Amino acid sequence: MTEQATAAQIKSMEELVSFLSHPRPELRKSASSLLISMTASDQSVFQLLALPKLDVVQALCRVVSDMRPIAEDAIKALINLTAANPTACERALKYDLLNRVMTQVEDSEWRLTDYSMMLLANVTTTPEGAKELLGYDAKATDATLALREKKIRTLTNAFLESEPEPEGVDAATGDAKWDDEYQYVANILANISQLEQGRAFLLKMRQNTSLVGALMPQLKSPNVVRRRGVAAALKNLCFDSDNHFYLYDQLDVPTNMMLLLAGPEPLDEEDKLGMNPVVFSQGDKKKREQDRQVRLAAVDCLLLLCTTRNGRKDLRRKKVYPIIRNAHLVEPDEEIGDQIYKLVDFLIRDEEGEEPDWNDIRAKSFASDQETKTGEDGEVVKPPPQSKAPEPKKPEPKAPEAKKQVETRVEDKKVKVPASSTSPAVVAEDENVSDDFAGQMANEMSALDVSSDEEDDDVDVD
């Protein structure tokens, strides 16, 4: 439980914050360094944000453009504050932090891009932050929207053109560490995909392709932060049924999700008919995605695509079932196993009912401010997918689960990735499945112990 600060503590903290505006740079540096340590504690964050006379967020925003050592400390402290409390995100927007940071990263001499991206990822976990990044604020004009779109596109191009470089192994978790200053762009894209305008931005066609199409290869990135963010963004796109045809027909999202879920298990020739050869071409050398958040997002994408009749037909045609059947047999995570059950049930049964009200689904899915702190390992999107910055180390974000927002703490290495919205309850529509296909599925289902005779099951993608 968070304790209220004593009068002496409040006075001491206010004096510390006041030093951020002192004319002597060495005093500003000392104050900013101390604030990094303080903001690593949730209790201190609460007390700092509750100061009656001084606004710590405003004071830190002012020195973001200070000399590099001071600016670095300020950004790290803001990462911690915005990861811990949405109020800090709101205040940061009030003091024009987004424009300050976006201007800095455009400077080729700027050397704090990784921290800047982490801070942007945290601030955009809130709907207000995502809207402001896209330029949809109260003062939006066609010109400002076009300019902001250009800036985000520039960041995305830098993300796509850069390659993560190995940087050893995290002693605490044993996970690989990466020198990848644009990795948190994946979190940012996952965060904006919670909004209709953000999804439109990702789907907008440019030079015969969309941005999300260009992002698909990142699902194979060795950096889990990138994989989590892109997987979370794809899940958010799958919540709009209007996008489904483009996602499964033009981008072949089902095959890309199958690639994540496929393992070394052999497949019968009959199972391979209709399946993209890339899924089984590696044979017993194929490795299944090891990150839980990415696997969950992959299953959720397939489940959401199953909420339309044509989507179910496409998944059957591409032979999704054999892949998820094998994945289920070795899946250690109970939540993912439950989602596979629901997916299998959709693929094998005759369904009755009407299509869901997707407007209602979107309202429920994206209205809640559910924020999920990512696991301590890869740190990002969930998923899509806020950060706290560590003093001595480079922060490693945590990836968002597909449904919550992304936060990161640099010190704790926690990153929140906007998780996509909660999954809709879906009533399946009338549909005919061949007797042979249904019989084959039913036999295999007995091994999974999945019930397929309930007509009114809800589909929840949590």
Walk through the language-model features, giving the residues of each.
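Elongated alpha-helical scaffolds that mediate protein-protein interactions in large eukaryotic proteins
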Residues: T2-A59, V63, M67, A71-D73, ...
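Intrinsically disordered, low-complexity regulatory regions
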Residues: M1-E15, P23, R28-D42, P266, ...
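Alpha-helical scaffold repeats of the Armadillo/HEAT/TPR superfamily
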Residues: A8-S12, L49-A59, A92-V101, L134-E161, ...
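Alpha-solenoid helical repeat scaffolds
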Residues: S30, A59, D73, R91, ...
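Acidic, Ser/Thr- and Gly/Pro-rich intrinsically disordered linkers and low-complexity segments
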Residues: E14-L16, R153-D179, L261-Q293, I336, ...
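Non-catalytic interaction/regulatory modules that flank or connect domains
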Residues: Y184, I192-Y248, V253-L259, G263, ...
